[in-house]
C-alpha cells in the first residue's frame, strides 16, 4: 500500500521544504492541502502550483472563508475570546478548521499519514496533533520540522540545495501567519524584547500616528452575532472584512506582547487584528447592557477559560463543548447596536441601544423621575457587610488576647 501523506500546506518555508523531505524520508506521495481563510496576499493558485513544483502528487485549495467566519470567528466573538486578555486567538482558531479539512482529504485520498510544518517550540504542533487525535486517530502524525530537528537556517539551505521554490530568505526570517481574523508576526529581530517593531512589518493596520479623521461606526448584533454595519446587512465574514479596513486604517488592533506558550516558554508576538478587536469590543459593550450582573460576572470567567482551552489546542475537547453551550445560552438577549469611534489606534464606545437592555433610566437617573427607593439601601448595606463586620470583630478581639 502506498504511503499517502496529507500535509497542512501554507506555501511558506517549512511546509514547502517538507514536501520533498517527506517524500524521501517516508517513501510516499504528498497531498498538499491549503485553506483560503481570507488571508489575502499571494494568489492561492500560486501556492497550489508551488506545492506541485516542490513535488506534491496533489495540491488542493479549499475556499473556507465563510466557514471560518461563521463557525470559528463567531464563537470567538460570543466568547470575547482574548488569551491573556489581549490576543484574539488569530492562529489558534484556524487550526481546528485546517485539521477538519486535512482529515477529510485523508479520507478522500486514502491517506495513511498526516503532517504539519510546526516546530517543537510552538503551540501549533499541539493544536494540530490533538485535533488529529480527536477526529481521526488512525492517521499517523509526522512533524518533520520538529522530529528531524530542522532549524530555519537548515530549511533555507535545504531548499536552496534542492531547488525548492520558497520566498523566504536569511535576510527576512520573519514567521508570519495570517487570515481574515488577523495577522501574527514572530522571530527575527523581534526575539530581542528590546527591539521595537519597525513600520514595515505591518500589513493590516496603518500607523496610528498618521492623523486620519475619526471614523464612527455602528455595529448591530442579533443574539451575539454581528448582522449589520451602519444599517447595512452583513455576513460575519463581511463584518470582519469591513472592520479590518476601517479599523485598520485607524491603526486599531496592533498588539506587541510576551505570550505564555503552552509548551512552557515565553514568546514575543506581534499581532494585527483590527476587525477582531473592534467586534469583540462592541460585543462586550452590548453584553454590559443586556446580561444580568451575576451572569455577566460568571461569564467573564468562562470566557477566559474558553480562550485558554482554544489556545491550548482543545477545540474538540469536552470542556470546550460545554463552555460553548453555556456561552450560547447567554447570547439570547445580546441584541442591539453599539456605536464606536475608531481613531488613532483606539476604540471609544459612545453609544448603546437595545430593546433587550437591562438599563432602566428611571432607576439610574439622579434627576426628577427617579424611581429608585433609597430607603431600602441602608438595610441592604448592613446585611451586605455583616459577615465581614463579624469576621473583623473576631480578629480584633483575637489580637487583643
UniProtKB/Swiss-Prot annotation:
L-citrulline binds at residues 87, 123, 127, 175, 259, 271. One of its GO terms (biological process) is urea cycle. GO terms for molecular function: argininosuccinate synthase activity; ATP binding. It comes from the Bacteria. Pathway: Amino-acid biosynthesis; L-arginine biosynthesis; L-arginine from L-ornithine and carbamoyl phosphate: step 2/3. Its EC number is 6.3.4.5. Keywords: Amino-acid biosynthesis, Arginine biosynthesis, ATP-binding, Cytoplasm, Ligase, Nucleotide-binding. Gene3D superfamilies: Argininosuccinate synthetase, chain A, domain 2 (3.90.1260.10), HUPs (3.40.50.620), Single helix bin (1.20.5.470). It is an enzyme of class 6 (ligase). It is found in: Cytoplasm. GO terms for cellular component: cytoplasm. L-aspartate binds at residues 119, 123-124. It catalyses: L-citrulline + L-aspartate + ATP = 2-(N(omega)-L-arginino)succinate + AMP + diphosphate + H(+). ATP binds at residues 8-16, 117. It holds the Pfam family Arginosuc_syn_C. The keyword Cytoplasm applies. Homotetramer. Belongs to the argininosuccinate synthase family. Type 1 subfamily. This is Argininosuccinate synthase. The lineage of its organism: Bacteria, Bacillati, Actinomycetota, Actinomycetes, Mycobacteriales.
